[in-house]
Amino acid sequence: MTHDYIVKSLAFDGEIRAYAALTTESVQEAQTRHYTWPTASAAMGRTMTATLLMGSMLKGEQKLTVTVDGKGPIGRIIADADAEGNVRAYVDKPQTHFPLNEQGKLDVRRAVGTDGSIQVVKDVGMKDYFSGASPIVSGELGEDFTYYFATSEQTPSSVGLGVLVNPDNSIKAAGGFIIQVMPGAKDETVTKLENAINNMQPVSKLIEQGLTPEGILNEILGEDNVQILETMQAQFECNCSHEKFLNAIKGLGEAEIQDMIKEDHGAEAICHFCGNKYNYSEAELEDLLASMNA
């Protein structure tokens, strides 16, 4: 099986910037950890793919967090990614599933809802943050991220996201693309791009047919027009740790920690993103209190 990866490219002599990714393994890892049902898997997987692609636009140690909250039954979908191809995600209600929609597809819109927003927070280093948001206009997520780029980042873009789920709940295929029009692009280039996107098959179908990220970009933009700049590995990766959660406990304050010692004789923390559990003994919490008062 081909491992997940991202492709960055230019097209039409630099007038178009394009990114594509295969994310089947990463979405499968998240599905296994959270035991998501098919509709939730599709919504989470689409959000993960978009977040991963947006992360690949960052540099160095920059990272971003995306929160999708359409006020639907699934609750919030939260994903974060960095510039190195690492992504992780979770959903509030992982066991969300509905009958297929009228098109015979997983009903992501019904799960996500259409009465909320996409929020993006980019950590660009030096304690500097960029924050943007846009309303959810579709609930299918591809159109919603397209709208986010147009309104919040003023970048005309097309975002395609797809997840296919097997009858046993495992992930059959996942991936997507973000294609962006660069400033100064000719009208005829934009028209060609619009026509190509309007006539293409759904991205999940392209992946199911075995198309690689390069193949997806060639299919949309035309093989002669695509210039591959870089490929990078992608994976589900959680950076949680015993120490990070201990710092989070410290942030709760002395009174709360005293309660944990007296009433619970310790503490347990569970990472939302990966499900890992961290246990803290009474002695550890007492040492933490002592260090806070030192």
From Swiss-Prot:
Alphabetical list of SUPFAM superfamilies matching this protein: Hsp33 domain (SSF64397), HSP33 redox switch-like (SSF118352)
Please name the source species: Staphylococcus haemolyticus (strain JCSC1435)
A GO BP term here is: protein refolding
Q: Which cysteines are joined by disulfide bonds?
A: 238-240, 271-274
> Which UniProt keywords are present, listed alphabetically?
Chaperone, Cytoplasm, Disulfide bond, Redox-active center, Zinc
Any one GO MF annotation of this record: unfolded protein binding
**Function per UniProt:** Redox regulated molecular chaperone. Protects both thermally unfolding and oxidatively damaged proteins from irreversible aggregation. Plays an important role in the bacterial defense system toward oxidative stress.
Provide the record's note on post-translational modification: Under oxidizing conditions two disulfide bonds are formed involving the reactive cysteines. Under reducing conditions zinc is bound to the reactive cysteines and the protein is inactive.
Q: Which InterPro entries match?
A: Heat_shock_Hsp33, Heat_shock_Hsp33_C, Heat_shock_Hsp33_N
Q: What is the protein name for this chain?
A: 33 kDa chaperonin
Compartment(s) where it occurs, according to its Swiss-Prot or TrEMBL record: Cytoplasm
- Membership in a protein family: Belongs to the HSP33 family.
Any one GO CC term of the record = cytoplasm
Q: Where mainly found?
A: cytoplasm
Classification via Gene3D superfamilies: Hsp33 domain, HSP33 redox switch-like
Keyword presence, Zinc: yes
**This protein's record includes keyword Zinc:** yes
Short name of one Pfam family: HSP33
